[in-house]
């Protein structure tokens, strides 16, 4: 009887964990389109944070930088180094794009762990990091695809498409497929890591006291920063590859 009771309690515990909801959305109707309202809300918050930081950074620049100015200059220098390393000498026009990608993803990832989104109640679903939604990560990956197609066409014209039959026309289907797998791998890698991190924290909080998940939360902050760097680095690498024509 005790064994049966223990089994029932275990099943109840598993049922409680399975009650953690993934994928519920708060929808807005805009014209004939249905959009994810919670993603727009959190994205606007992230954009507001970035715009406010940019305004502070350029408000009163000093010849001898202050601590705050040193921080912003370090961030800019870091983004420039990533762009130059991956793209090459023609990196300057792409610094704003790579920087925007990196900062948006970085702040989005960290907002999921640091901002108390659950305080805001929605009719359906709940607020979370923008990158916790597959639509956001796919949109970022598609922007990257447009960017490296634009870079290749701008540099080489229609000759850019000759890469699809190199080194032999037999590889044409594989080379075309590669351009579809690049954005897919970018989007699913980012989405999967951020979603998994939030799910692990939620499950641990439901199973053990609050103190135990804290190391996991710090690990999540670290991996969130790494994911932003990986996305920006790969985006820059794809752009550099399309301009140079090498694999």
Curated annotation (Swiss-Prot):
- Keywords noted in UniProt: ATP synthesis, CF(0), Chloroplast, Hydrogen ion transport, Ion transport, Membrane, Plastid, Thylakoid, Transmembrane, Transmembrane helix, Transport
Cite the GO molecular-function annotations of the record: proton-transporting ATP synthase activity, rotational mechanism
Which CDD domains does this one have? ATP-synt_Fo_a_6
Q: Which domain of life is it from?
A: Eukaryota
Q: Which InterPro entries does this entry report, sorted A to Z?
A: ATP_syn_F0_a_bact/chloroplast, ATP_synth_F0_asu, ATP_synth_F0_asu_AS, F0_ATP_A_sf
> Transmembrane region positions?
38-58, 95-115, 134-154, 199-219, 220-240
* One Gene Ontology term, aspect cellular component: plasma membrane
User: Where located?
Assistant: Plastid, Chloroplast thylakoid membrane
Which Pfam families has this protein been placed in?
Answer: ATP-synt_A (PF00119)
The annotated subunit structure for this chain is: F-type ATPases have 2 components, CF(1) - the catalytic core - and CF(0) - the membrane proton channel. CF(1) has five subunits: alpha(3), beta(3), gamma(1), delta(1), epsilon(1). CF(0) has four main subunits: a, b, b' and c.
Q: Main role?
A: Key component of the proton channel; it plays a direct role in the translocation of protons across the membrane.
Protein family membership: Belongs to the ATPase A chain family.
Q: What is the official name of this protein in its record? A: ATP synthase subunit a, chloroplastic
Naturally occurring in which organism (per UniProt): Fagopyrum esculentum subsp. ancestrale (Wild buckwheat)
């Amino acid at each position: 009887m005790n064994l049966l009771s223990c089994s029932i309690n275990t099943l109840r515990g598993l049922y409680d964990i399975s009650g953690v909801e993934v994928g519920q959305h708060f929808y807005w109707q805009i014209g004939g389109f249905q959009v994810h309202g919670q993603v727009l809300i959190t994205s606007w918050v992230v954009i507001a944070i970035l715009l406010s930081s940019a305004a502070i950074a350029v408000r009163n620049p000093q010849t001898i930088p202050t601590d705050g100015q040193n921080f912003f200059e370090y961030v800019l220098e870091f983004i420039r180094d990533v762009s130059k390393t991956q793209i090459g000498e023609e990196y300057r026009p792409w610094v704003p794009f790579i920087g925007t990608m990196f900062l948006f993803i970085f702040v989005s990832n960290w907002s999921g762990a640091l901002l108390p989104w659950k305080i805001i109640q929605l009719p359906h679903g709940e607020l979370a990091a923008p990158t916790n939604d597959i639509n956001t990560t796919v949109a970022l990956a598609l922007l990257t695809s447009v960017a490296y197609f634009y870079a290749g066409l701008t540099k080489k014209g229609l000759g850019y498409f000759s890469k699809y039959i190199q080194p032999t026309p037999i590889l044409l289907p594989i080379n075309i497929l590669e351009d579809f797998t690049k954005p897919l791998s970018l989007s699913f890698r980012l989405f999967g890591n951020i979603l998994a991190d939030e799910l692990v924290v939620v499950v641990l909080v439901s199973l053990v006291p609050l103190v135990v998940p804290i190391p996991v939360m710090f690990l999540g902050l670290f991996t969130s920063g790494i994911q932003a760097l990986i996305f920006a680095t790969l985006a820059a690498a794809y752009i550099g590859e399309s301009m140079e024509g090498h694999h």
